[in-house]
Amino acid sequence: MPSNLPDLSTLCDILIVGAGPAGTAAAITAVRQGLNVTIIDKAVFPRDKCCGDGLTTLALRELEKLRFDPATVPSWTDIDAAWLRSPSGRELRLPMPNNGKFAAVTPRVELDNALVIQARSEGVTIVEDCTYESMAVNSESVCVSVNLKNTPQQITASWVIAADGMWSPVRKSLGLSESGYLGEWHAFRQYANNVTGVANERLIVWFEKDLLPGYAWSFPLPNNRVNIGFGVVRDGKRRIQDMKDVWTDLLQRPHVVEALGPDFVMEDRHTAWPIPARIDEAITGSGRVLFVGDAAMATDT
């Protein structure tokens, strides 16, 4: 093993695969109970993650339980109201309660990095550029094979938490993945800048006739930027590969252009991702392995 790499052979109480919000939240919670926790992630932080960037009331309450400080996120934007547009064109403002925080927007690249920093500060060992390969489970522990910067290593843990997303390599390696499963929903998003219309300060949800029961959104960020996108249910009635054409059309609709302003500029490339939302049917644990977040298909719960 190269001398500049950490030795991961020491036994830990919990090994978590994936340093997204589900993984870091589990790690922070466990380390506060006096457990020895290690997280591995194939990425190097900060890294982006395809997401709408909106934080619901439940998400904010969970962050409060972690004693997370929004001030550690440069682009954190509190939301005081949601603006909805019906398929018929009627617009409605829904104010948030004024006795706390009930919605916010923050880029995942910033939020996830801030949670990684907090987890490290509380004693969690986080190993980046470390890819999960396989595991061997026995009655007392789990031996996990990983690839750390192209160097094979093994980690032994009493328990494993798989927070490794929709495609969950851990779930797949245990033979628990459903063949052909692509999620219940599919979403598409991109960032825009030079937003001079009302979208630069409003959280907007458009219920478009052709997207129902899905919807489109524009979530405000600092410096006249927004996260804009749409999501549709996988019901077999539309081809997911046609989403790019839907996106092009959506950005030309008069009410969307009016909200963004005439000179908005789309940034970089668009991204799309599947959304698993069937936790009631999902296998959330197997022996010494637990699944959380998207790996547990827990969207919207």
Model region roles, listed by residue range:
Residues 44-66:
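Conserved N-terminal glycine-rich FAD pyrophosphate-binding loop of Rossmann-like flavoproteins
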Residues 236-301:
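FAD/FMN-dependent oxidoreductases across multiple families
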Residues 118-258, 281:
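Predominantly flavin-linked oxidoreductase catalytic cores and closely associated redox partners
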Residues 60-113:
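A conserved beta-strand/loop capping segment in the N-terminal third of enzymes
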Residues 31-51:
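Glycine-rich FAD pyrophosphate-binding loop
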Residues 5-22:
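Beta1/beta-strand and adjacent pyrophosphate-binding region of the FAD-binding site
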Residues 22, 45, 167:
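Conserved Rossmann-like nucleotide-cofactor binding loop
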Residues 14-16, 37, 289:
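Conserved hydrophobic helix-helix packing surfaces used for dimerization/oligomerization
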